Structure formats: C-alpha cells, structure tokens
Amino acid sequence: MHSHTNETAATSTTAGAVTNGAGGSGAGAAGAHGSTEGKIRCIFLSEFHATAGCKISCQVPDNYISKDVFDAINVYIIPKQHLQRCILTVNAMDVKIVGYPVGIQDQQKYARNAFLFNLCFVCDSRARSVQYEPVVKKLSEYLIMMEEESCFLSREDDKRRLQNIFETVLRDLNERKVATIVEGDNTIYLKIVMHKPDPPPVKDHMVPLLLANLRDAPLDNWDLTTQQILPYINGINHVARIAAEADVETDLVKSCIQNLVYYGVVQLLPILKYSNVYMTQNLKHLIQSASLSGACRKYVALRPDKTLPSVQRIFQFYASMTHGVTLRAICQRLCPQHHNIDERRMVIFGLQHRFIRCIHKYPVFTGSVPSGRQKMYTGLISFDEICCKTGLSPCTIERDIEKDTNVTVIWK
C-alpha cells in the first residue's frame, strides 16, 4: 500500500498480500503504478457502519469486489485517522484499489460522532493507476460537500442516486476520459489526464538546461533542493559540478533534475567541449521559420547590444558540423566571435531545437583481461561519463586510449 498527500509521500506499509509502492504524482510515479493502461473495472463506496463495521455500501458493477476480498483488505480501505485525506493505493488479490479515505466529524449527526468513508476506483493489479488519483480525490471532495449539505452518503434513501452517479462516471471515464455529474444545483466535471512516462535516469555527466525562466519565479515556490541548485543550471555545468558548487548531495540533485525534466522545464544536454563532434539534422527548420531564426539570432549573439548575427552566418556555422570535424576546428576556420556569435550558445540552441546532435565516443577494450580504467571501456560507457566518473580531463583519457593498442573507439 502506498499513500501520499499532494505530491509528498506520507506513509508506506506492507502487510500480507498488500504490496508496497512508491507514491507520487511526478517523476517515478508512472513506473510504480503499473506498466499498462487499464480501464476502471469498478467504483465502490465503503463506509464504517455504527453496528455492521466496515462494509461496501454501494458498488458498480455489483459484487465486483467480493466479501472475501474486501474482508482481507478493509483495514486499508478504512484506515487510521492519520491516513485520511490522502490517496491510498492497495495492490492485492489481483486488483488495484485507489482510494481517498475521509472522516467527517459531527457529534449530532452520527452515532459514533464521525462518518468514515472511502470512494475507491478498482483496476487490474498490473494496470497503471496514477492517472486516476486526481479524479478519485476530486470526486471524493464532491461527495464530502454533498454529505455535509444533505447527508447524501449516510442516508440509505440516496444509495440508488449514488449508484447512478457511479454508473455514469464508470462508463464515461472509460469511454471518453471525461464525465459530468449534475446533482441538484451541484455540477462536477471529471477528466483523466494521462501522465507522461518517466524520463531516463539522470547521470553525473549530463548538462541540464532551463527551458522556462524559472529564475524569475519566487524561490518560495520551489523545494529546498531546487532553490539551492537553480543558480548553477546554465546549460554548461554538468550534474556533478552543480552538486559540488551547490554543496548538495549528487543523488538529491539527480532526483530534483529528473523531476524538472518530467515537468518539461529542463532539458538534458551533453557536456559542451571543443573536442566534440556534431552532426546536423532538421537544419531546414532554421531557414523555414522566421520566428525560430529570429529567436536564434538573439540567443546566440555574443553582445546583444551590437548588430545581431545574420541567419546566413549562423546557418554556415551549423552546416559546417559534420562527422570527424570538431567544434574547435570549426571555430578556428569560421571565427564565430568576429561575427558576434557565441559558439557555446549556438551549440546549446542547436541541441535544444534538435538542429544538431552530439556524436559520442565509446571506448571498447578488445584485449583479454581488462585492468584499471580498461574495465570501463565496455562500449556502453561514453567518453563524457568516463571523465566524470574518474575525475580526469578529456586530454588525459585521450592519451590513455591512444597509447593502448587494445582499445578501439566507437563513434555513435
């Protein structure tokens, strides 16, 4: 079972057949909630009855969750008070149940001074369920309002109306991903928003680039780690350097940046080195789009107060990027700074808009028994990653590889 309030994990418990998962609505959540998109199989309302105890009072379709299954897991459906008003997901007995347990306190209305209930969505145990969590919470808050206004849930007379609501929600969310409920003067709109897949893991040698101007946002809007690392995210510093300069543990920095990537405010780039080789792709978009070429001219200008570089000059620079030609060689030949072009910002803009891509080097040890750094030359670890892991300069690694006749370099 996992639980969380908003985007922060609150409690995590494992007991018997109930599995432990990682709560959250951001990066990491999608994988934890299952691997396949699945329909809502059932919607039910459970409540704690004054004499009968924990029971299902309304269910669509009827008896989808059997009494035996419910009896085995009901301690997690109507949990202790500290787990109320937060999403709980129970994965047991071939079903996954997403709920939002609630307790309404009122000594005059209720026999036990409180009305405890939980609205639950049920899907297959291996189905992804994170997209249902905001809907469960919103519908639960709607039912809380209805209960406080007219005892809509606790009155037996209203159970048929509740069943009609569940039938509508189940059908419309499965078929159209949206549902509208009109009950008296109250209307509620529900919509399933599909979550993006998790971004790939962030590594030490990756370079984050801000895609939105977050520095202008009040720092109070961000968690402590983001506040600490934000000043060091500039499209040049790699993750390990950001962690060192911000004095934040590297794993925390990676987690924070992965979250920013998930929300689309950060893009990961390769380390910018003058020994890098780049290849062009989709370069025609720079010429075809006036707005894009205008943005590029402003972004790459070495001195924005001077005449902006021409699109033709920028295009010439990008078009010179080809296999076997380093950034250093291009700069020596074209002298971009003489034309008010900052070559580093030009590379960043090209990577960001996918005009160019970096060709990475992967050393491969071809001898019999590797030793020392040779153990890293597997063909799976890039040159940049090796430099970051060892703390050695690219020149040192280059010399090391050139002297070793048992090492071949693959470019890809």
From Swiss-Prot:
It comes from the Eukaryota. Belongs to the NPR2 family. GO terms for cellular component: autolysosome; cytoplasm; GATOR1 complex; nucleus; Seh1-associated complex; vacuolar membrane. Its main location: cytoplasm. Component of the GATOR complex consisting of mio, Nup44A/Seh1, Im11, Nplr3, Nplr2, Wdr24, Wdr59 and Sec13. Within the GATOR complex, probable component of the GATOR1 subcomplex which is likely composed of Iml1, Nplr2 and Nplr3. Interacts with Nprl3. It is found in: Cytoplasm; Lysosome. One of its GO terms (biological process) is cellular response to starvation. Disruption phenotype: Pupal homozygous semi-lethal. Under nutrient-replete conditions, larvae display a significant increase in TORC1 activity and adult escapers display a small, but significant increase in body weight and a reduction in climbing. Newly hatched males display decreased tolerance to both complete starvation and amino acid starvation, likely due to decreased triacylglyceride (TAG) storage and the inability to down-regulate TORC1 activity and activate catabolic metabolism and autophagy. InterPro entries: NPR2-like. This is GATOR complex protein NPRL2. An essential component of the GATOR subcomplex GATOR1 which functions as an inhibitor of the amino acid-sensing branch of the TORC1 signaling pathway. The two GATOR subcomplexes, GATOR1 and GATOR2, regulate the TORC1 pathway in order to mediate metabolic homeostasis, female gametogenesis and the response to amino acid limitation and complete starvation. Keywords: Cell cycle, Cell division, Cytoplasm, Lysosome, Meiosis, Mitosis. The keyword Cytoplasm applies. It holds the Pfam family NPR2.
